[in-house]
C-alpha cells in the first residue's frame, strides 16, 4: 500500500528522524541479548529483529499488523531463529513467562487498548524480563487535527501549541498518507498502566539531537523546543 512504500523509502534514507534521534537512544538502553528469547512488537521490515539475532539472541519473533511489512521482513531476513508473524498487536498470543526481552519502536501509540497490551506483555515476560519501547510523546499526540507549530507571517516558528491534552483517545494525523489513526494518552496514564501491571520503570529518555545529528539533518533543531 501507499503508506508502506513511502515508509520504506524514508527509512532507506540514512539521515532521518528514526536513525538520528530515536534509534540512538533506544540502543543505549538495550540489555545483553545473548541466548535470550525476544519479542519485537511492531517489527516493521524486521531490521531490529535481525539485529537481535546478530547480537546472540536465541530466538526472535517479530509481529506487525501490516502484511506488507511482514512479507518484506521475511524476504529481507532469513534465519532459523527468526519468526515473523502478521497479527494485530491486541491479538498477539499470551506466552506466559517465556519471553526475556520485549521491544517496540514507535508502535504503542497506534494501539487502541493500551491496558490490554501491557497486561499481555507483563504476563509474557519471564522473571527479570525487560520491556523496552519508544512512542510519540503525549505533548505531540494531544492536538486534535490542529496545526501544532504556530508560525508568523514569514513562516518562522513561534511556538508549539498543545491542546486537548487531558482528552484521551483516538486521533487522526496526516503522516505519509492522510488520516492515519493513532491514540493519545497522557503521560500519567502511560506510566501508571506500566506500574499497575507489575512493571518497574528504570529509565525514561526524552531524546535531543546530537551536534552530528543536527549537521546531518538541520530540521532536528525543533526537537529542543518540544519533546518528540
Question: Can you name each region flagged by the protein language model?
Answer:
Residues 1-33, 47, 51, 69-72, 131-169:
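Conserved class I S-adenosyl-L-methionine
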Residues 39-41, 45-91:
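Class I SAM-dependent methyltransferase SAM/SAH-binding core
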Residues 103:
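A conserved beta-strand element that flanks and buttresses the S-adenosyl-L-methionine
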Residues 106-109:
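Short catalytic micro-motifs in class I SAM-dependent methyltransferases
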Residues 115-130:
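A short glycine-rich, Lys/Arg-flanked "PGG" loop and its adjoining helix->strand segment in the class I
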Residues 135, 139-143, 174-188:
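Acceptor-substrate binding/catalytic loop of class I
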Residues 170, 181-204:
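Short alpha-helix
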